[in-house]
């Protein structure tokens, strides 16, 4: 079993404490066993849909799906995959806003298991620590790689960054298209969903929040 880092444990505990952790159970089977079991079930699902799995285009699809679920699009359910964090002491006394815009978001709607596609913007005011800019992208990707609802994802990101950076002064903005709306049901291809979460100065000071939103809404 892979070791879970202290940062990952702290983030998970913070999410649980706030009641915003993804509803998950700890698997009792090894990954290989889970892949095998998922493939068998997907084989039956595809047969029930009416697909002929003897066709060479379809025969490996159950195995592909099993690998995709465990190793790729739902890999963020395993905190052993949480990005390795190297926190840097804020020796330069950086006090201005650090902001990363247009982070690619590709997640999966937990209601219909179809794609959520969008962008994430994250900002924070450093206190004692800063992190490499790419770590912000990696944390977004980690929480995207699990069945999600956008509202909870936004709150999870806020809490994760607050926990790692040891500051409340964090803002998260998410703009996404949901394929459960675009590809089924109403089939609206134009609409998108916006969610945001604020802590510390972003929550308390309107001008700071406006400064953040002025750049993400361009």
UniProtKB/Swiss-Prot annotation:
Any Pfam family matching the protein: GTP_cyclohydroI
Name of the gene encoding the protein in the UniProt record: folE
PANTHER family, per database record: GTP CYCLOHYDROLASE 1 (PTHR11109:SF7), GTP CYCLOHYDROLASE I (PTHR11109)
GO biological process, one term: tetrahydrobiopterin biosynthetic process
Reaction(s) this enzyme catalyzes, per UniProt: GTP + H2O = 7,8-dihydroneopterin 3'-triphosphate + formate + H(+)
Taxonomy of the source species: Bacteria, Pseudomonadati, Pseudomonadota, Gammaproteobacteria, Pasteurellales
A GO CC term assigned to this protein in UniProt: cytoplasm
Organism encoding this protein: Haemophilus influenzae (strain PittEE)
Record keywords, A-Z: GTP-binding, Hydrolase, Metal-binding, Nucleotide-binding, One-carbon metabolism, Zinc
Source superkingdom: Bacteria
Pathway: Cofactor biosynthesis; 7,8-dihydroneopterin triphosphate biosynthesis; 7,8-dihydroneopterin triphosphate from GTP: step 1/1
Protein's UniProt name: GTP cyclohydrolase 1
NCBIfam families (alphabetical): folE (TIGR00063), PRK09347.1-1 (NF006824), PRK09347.1-3 (NF006826)
Class of the enzyme per the UniProt entry, highest EC level: hydrolase
Subunit structure: Toroid-shaped homodecamer, composed of two pentamers of five dimers.
Residues noted as binding Zn(2+) in the record, renumbered to the chain: 109, 112, 180
HAMAP family found in the cross-reference section: FolE
InterPro entries reported for this sequence: GTP-CH-I_C/QueF, GTP-CH-I_N, GTP_CycHdrlase_I, GTP_CycHdrlase_I_CS, GTP_CycHdrlase_I_dom
EC number(s) given by UniProt: 3.5.4.16
Family, similarity comment: Belongs to the GTP cyclohydrolase I family.
Gene Ontology MF terms in the entry: GTP binding; GTP cyclohydrolase I activity; zinc ion binding
């Amino acid at each position: 079993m892979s070791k879970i880092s202290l940062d990952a444990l702290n983030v998970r505990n913070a999410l649980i404490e706030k009641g915003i952790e993804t509803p998950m159970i700890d698997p009792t089977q090894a990954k290989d066993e889970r892949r095998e079991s998922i493939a068998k079930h997907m084989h039956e699902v595809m047969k029930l849909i009416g697909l002929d799995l003897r066709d060479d285009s379809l025969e490996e699809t159950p195995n592909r799906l099993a690998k995709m679920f465990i190793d790729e699009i739902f890999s963020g359910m395993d905190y052993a995959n949480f990005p390795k964090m190297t926190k840097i002491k804020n020796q330069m006394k950086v006090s201005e806003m650090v902001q990363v815009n247009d982070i690619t978001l590709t997640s999966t709607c937990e209601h219909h298991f179809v794609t959520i596609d969008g962008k994430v913007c994250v900002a924070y005011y450093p206190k004692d620590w800063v992190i490499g800019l790419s770590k912000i992208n990696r944390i977004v990707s980690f929480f995207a790689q699990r069945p999600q609802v956008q509202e909870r994802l936004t709150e999870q990101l806020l809490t994760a960054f607050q926990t790692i950076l040891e500051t409340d002064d964090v803002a998260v903005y998410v703009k996404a298209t949901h394929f459960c709306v675009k590809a089924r049901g109403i089939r609206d291809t134009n609409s998108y969903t916006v969610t945001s979460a604020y802590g510390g100065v972003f929550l308390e000071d309107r001008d700071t929040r406006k400064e953040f939103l002025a750049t993400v809404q361009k």
